[in-house]
């Protein structure tokens, strides 16, 4: 099968209201996720064995901790798929910038491999699987801007008038 290349879009929170702290360490919130154009680019080459690889490695992130590999493994485990994949990442989004790069990469991986491996999970099933990887993953699975509550996993799709955004990322990282 020929390689599949997809963009993993970034997002911005047009507003963010923290409404409480949960016992599991997450915060309850209300936010408006706006998906943007651009983002990281991922190329998927399927293999006939169950091995997963990611190139290039991201400095400071062990491969087994990378959300791309974790998403692929989660899909294998959920579906019993015995195929594998070699994944190339062209990183365009800065890490720790609050743009959802890791979550978007995980969602893009789930969507791509669900298709390439013929897993046939629904969008709702992929969103549920993605929520186990990160609170922002479901909005990227849904693929459209949304009002979010809970930990960001209770989504109401919304149409937002097209706007232009200038995103400036300072030379520091924020753990989100």
Please report, for each region that a protein language model flagged, where it lies by residue.
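Solvent-exposed beta-strand sheet faces enriched in polar/charged residues
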Residues: 15, 45, 55, 86-90, ...
